[in-house]
Amino acid sequence: MLLYLMMVFLAEYNYPSHFKIDQRISAEIIIEQTNKISGDPHFYMAIAWVESRVKSGRVSHTGDYGLFQINYNFWGKKWGYKDRNKFLKDMSNPYHAVIAATIVINEMKRYKACDGLHLAACYNGGPNWKNSKNKDKILKYSNKVNCLAKAYKRKYPKWKK
């Protein structure tokens, strides 16, 4: 119980005040795990916020699942998932979700079109996002993620260890 109360206190101190307890717990795990893999927790948290509001159990109309809205038809099947419910459960678990998002991000980093600020665009629209009919929406998404990551970095510098 004491550990739980400490976690809630730390969450209040370290996260936006509008985060609910389940969001704070997921955020804590995302930040911790992202630091373990030498990722940018501000960027990951920005993606998680834009994609799912850091809420588990989310499913989009396009078949994207969990905290980072990982696409089942592409990534889930590629990773051998046969059951959408199992995929949703795993992508809603922040430990699994960070690994999945890292795989997607690392795959996108292989492409020149995904350099720098365009990494968020690639996360959303794939490496050929520039040729997409949704290019404007993808750029808007990318700008939102990058601005939020920058704001998180400014407001929560201690997220990065």
List each model region and its residues.
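Sec-dependent N-terminal signal peptides
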Residues: M1-L10
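Catalytic glycan-binding domains that act on GlcNAc-containing polysaccharides
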Residues: F9-K161
